């Protein structure tokens, strides 16, 4: 469990205090994949680097598995950091070392295992990330996705309890991003590893995260289960992320719908209701007609969801709206 208790961070720049993270409290349960999303300068990298004390907080308390990390001395901090792996946007591999030697580096520096034990652990890790036949290659011989897999293997070398991911997929193409996210999901599931990742891409959050915190200007403006936050956004920053992801311009959409007759509603379906024949049933029962103006079906981790924007005319509209609500479908009246 990772817990922030009123943690804040301020930098001193040219004689002025610049707040990077305002007083923040949050909790990440063991085994969760927790996402931090925000635009550049939102404070998400600062928050992530506070977890393993690459940055020291200006105030507040950070507790990991009932241990006050902010109170650790140098020796305790070295011990603690062996329990926390980290992967980076630009991989941070040593170009003069082979893949195997890059993965072995944390174990070599720790000095606790024999050479044969290190070799055995490295072989196991490379097999896990699908690079067993790349051990003797150098980083320059690898693709971006392969480099990040080496970074993941290296981060897992000391058998950490926590994995921190700093924009780990932002330098990768969409197909490679999907394969790396699938690997992270497998690692989380098989090792019960707690993962905290930061990103500016909603698709990353949707694919792998259980919980999400949305950040803006050093403040967590909204947090909760991914489906709750992104299917029913409350804060303007969250709504902007949703609109960017769906490529929606509210002003353009309002103009497009201006001459469409009837009431305009947006329905959000989750789980089994996503594929249920609800529209036809409601139309027959209440006598309404509907036109589909926009729609999508996607998944949040393993849960399907769908969104439809409808123009509804005729019949008993209030009965139709009540029927949608009774079917556990979230309805937003746009006009």
From Swiss-Prot:
Topological relation to the membrane, as annotated: Peripheral membrane protein
One term under GO cellular component: plasma membrane
Location of the ABC transporter domain: 2-242
Domain of life (superkingdom): Bacteria
GO molecular function: ABC-type D-methionine transporter activity; ATP binding; ATP hydrolysis activity
CDD domains: ABC_MetN_methionine_transporter
SMART domains: AAA, NIL
Claim: Translocase is one of the keywords in the record: yes
Positions annotated to bind ATP: 38-45
Localization per Swiss-Prot or TrEMBL: Cell inner membrane
UniProt entry keywords in alphabetical sequence: Amino-acid transport, ATP-binding, Cell inner membrane, Cell membrane, Membrane, Nucleotide-binding, Translocase, Transport
First-tier enzyme category under EC: translocase
EC id: 7.4.2.11
Protein family according to the UniProt entry: Belongs to the ABC transporter superfamily. Methionine importer (TC 3.A.1.24) family.
Purpose: Part of the ABC transporter complex MetNIQ involved in methionine import. Responsible for energy coupling to the transport system.
Protein name: Methionine import ATP-binding protein MetN 1
Gene: metN1
């Amino acid at each position: 469990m990772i817990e922030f208790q009123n943690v804040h961070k301020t930098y001193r720049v040219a004689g002025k205090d610049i707040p990077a993270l305002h007083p923040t409290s949050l909790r990440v349960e063991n085994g969760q994949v927790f996402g931090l999303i925000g635009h550049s300068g939102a404070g998400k990298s600062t928050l992530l680097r506070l977890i393993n004390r690459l940055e020291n907080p200006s105030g507040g308390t950070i507790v990991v598995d009932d241990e006050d990390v902010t109170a650790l001395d140098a020796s305790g901090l070295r011990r603690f950091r062996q329990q926390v792996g980290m992967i980076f946007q630009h991989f941070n591999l040593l170009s003069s070392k082979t893949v195997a030697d890059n993965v072995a580096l944390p174990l070599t520096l720790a000095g606790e295992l024999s050479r044969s034990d290190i070799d055995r652990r490295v072989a196991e890790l490379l097999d896990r990330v699908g690079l067993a036949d790349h051990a003797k290659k150098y980083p320059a011989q690898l693709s971006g996705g392969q480099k990040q897999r080496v970074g993941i293997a290296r981060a897992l070398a000391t058998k950490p309890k926590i994995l921190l991911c700093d924009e780990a997929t932002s330098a990768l193409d969409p197909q490679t991003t999907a394969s790396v996210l699938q690997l992270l999901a497998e690692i989380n599931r098989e090792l019960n590893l707690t993962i905290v990742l930061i990103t500016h891409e909603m698709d990353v959050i949707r694919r792998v995260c259980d919980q999400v915190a949305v950040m803006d200007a050093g403040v967590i403006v909204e947090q909760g289960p991914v489906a709750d936050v992104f299917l029913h956004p409350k804060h303007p920053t969250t709504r902007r992320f949703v609109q960017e992801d769906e490529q929606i311009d509210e002003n353009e959409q309002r103009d497009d719908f201006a001459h469409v007759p009837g009431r305009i509603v947006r329905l959000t379906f989750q789980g089994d209701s996503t594929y249920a024949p609800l529209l036809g049933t409601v139309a027959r029962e209440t006598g309404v007609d509907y036109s589909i103006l926009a729609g999508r079906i996607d998944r949040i981790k393993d849960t399907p969801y769908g969104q439809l924007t409808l123009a509804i005319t005729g019949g008993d509209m209030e009965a139709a709206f009540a029927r949608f609500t009774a079917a556990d479908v979230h309805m937003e009246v746009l006009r």
